[in-house]
Amino acid sequence: MESQSCKLTIKDLMSAGAHFGHQTRRWNPKMKLYIFEEKNGLYIINLAKTLQQLRNALPHIRKVIQDNKTVLFVGTKKQAKCVIREAAIEAGEFFIAERWLGGMLTNMTTIRNSIKTLDKIEKDLSRNQAYLTKKEAALLAKRHQKLLRNLEGIRYMKKAPGLLVVVDPSYEKIAVAEAKKLGIPVLALVDTNCDPTPIDHVIPCNDDSLKSIRLIINVIKENIIEAKHKLGIEIVSPVKSLEVPDLSAFESSQDDESDEENREEDLLAKKFDGEAN
């Protein structure tokens, strides 16, 4: 399978700062294979190997699409979350960009129950707005925002993905562990402080640089889009616009919450959790 969409050069990677690893005292010896040299107290990543590893991984990404499987992008640290979200939406794939909740892969029943709760709250806010007190509406709106923030990118994911694309596997170690437990391959952007052992497709690079992350994730995204176009697969965003009221109207004017408000929110949340099951 020839790679048409890896037009990156070593110069592109260098311009994005992809070659800068961590300080030499913060390295993982298992990354030695991908290190070019030590300079000014930093390890410099071998960008020729970065390019080679990326090119080797692309046919596997396209094979996932050809097999009618999905890709789950995971990147919750601040440098990655916007890039991950944008790329997944453009490619029509799923994503986690805020917080990995334990069991997102290994206990999908619990996650689906949370999604049912989210659906229920949206319906209640849309249909029963006139019957809710301002306080009840505010509590529901807050609960809605919490759930949506964490579940937005996997809300319509019906089964386990065929591939995880991860930025910084040491930061996303729970996601990687769950994927390995289920036999799901992992492609990861891996810095010099990470253990590459559990990763199926190691892309050695600076995983703390926004430019570096964006450059490599965009290549992955473009290959997914290209594979879908060739197969005539429609690209459908994992995030759908929903007919819900403007939730800002329900937001509390105070940033600090009392213990009583927290208790009331929990009670209301339990009520809807129970009705959604």
UniProtKB/Swiss-Prot annotation:
Basic and acidic residues compositional bias, start-end: 265-277
Region (Disordered): 247-277
SS bonds (residue pairs): none
Pfam families: Ribosomal_S2 (PF00318)
Bilayer-crossing regions: none
Biased composition (Acidic residues): 253-264
Any GO BP: translation
Family: Belongs to the universal ribosomal protein uS2 family.
NCBIfam families named among the record's database cross-references: rpsB_bact (TIGR01011)
Protein's name according to its UniProt entry: Small ribosomal subunit protein uS2
